[in-house]
Structures are given as C-alpha cells and as structure tokens.
Amino acid sequence: MIPGEIITPSGEIELNAGRDTVKLLVANTGDRPIQVGSHFHFYEVNYALIFDRELALGMRLDIPAGTAVRFEPGDEKEVSLVPLVGSRRVYGFNGRVNGEINAEGRGG
C-alpha cells in the first residue's frame, strides 16, 4: 500500500442504492447562474429557482458528494432528489426549517 492510496472494490459503485427518488423540473428565472451543492437542502435553494418546493422538503440532489448542479439564467432541467438521512434535522441554509423533518417530509 502506498501512503494515501485508496483501494476500492472492483466494479461500479451505485450511489444512494435503494433510496426513493423524486424527479423535479427546475427553472432558473433569475438573471444570474445558480449552483446547488450535493448536500444542500433543496427546499431552501435560491428563490429564483422555480419548482414544486413541497416535494423537495427533506430532500437533496441525487449526485456524488462534493459535486453540484449549475442552472444558467433561463435554464430548465430535470433533477433527481433523494431524502436526507440520519437524524433528519435541518438547520441553517436559508432558515426555513430549523428543526426535524419527519418521515413524511414535513417539518416536525
């Protein structure tokens, strides 16, 4: 082994295997690009992004950790979301939840 070497199993690694997903059509109605990171609570993203926010409560993008999706002005694209896991407590971001999200996705 080389110091710092990462040894992974052979084959493909499926991200978020077995998790429920939601697909949403998202439009950037603003005049600036908007970039959303992999673990940002999608319900609380910039208000220039128009989509069904209630479906995004308790969800994040279904993309690899450390990556992001960029929405250029006027862009409209479909994204896939997965539920936040763990304690399902959401604090910060834009301050819209600041507490627990129950199993149905509603603030608790």
Swiss-Prot record:
CDD domains: Urease_beta. One of its GO terms (biological process) is urea catabolic process. Keywords: Cytoplasm, Hydrolase. It catalyses: urea + 2 H2O + H(+) = hydrogencarbonate + 2 NH4(+). The keyword Cytoplasm applies. InterPro entries: Urease_beta-like, Urease_betasu_sf, Urease_subunit. Its EC number is 3.5.1.5. Pathway: Nitrogen metabolism; urea degradation; CO(2) and NH(3) from urea (urease route): step 1/1. GO terms for molecular function: urease activity. It is found in: Cytoplasm. Coiled coil: none annotated. Pfam families: Urease_beta. GO terms for cellular component: urease complex. Belongs to the urease beta subunit family. HAMAP family: Urease_beta. Heterotrimer of UreA (gamma), UreB (beta) and UreC (alpha) subunits. Three heterotrimers associate to form the active enzyme. This is Urease subunit beta. It comes from Nostoc sp. (strain PCC 7120 / SAG 25.82 / UTEX 2576). The gene is ureB.
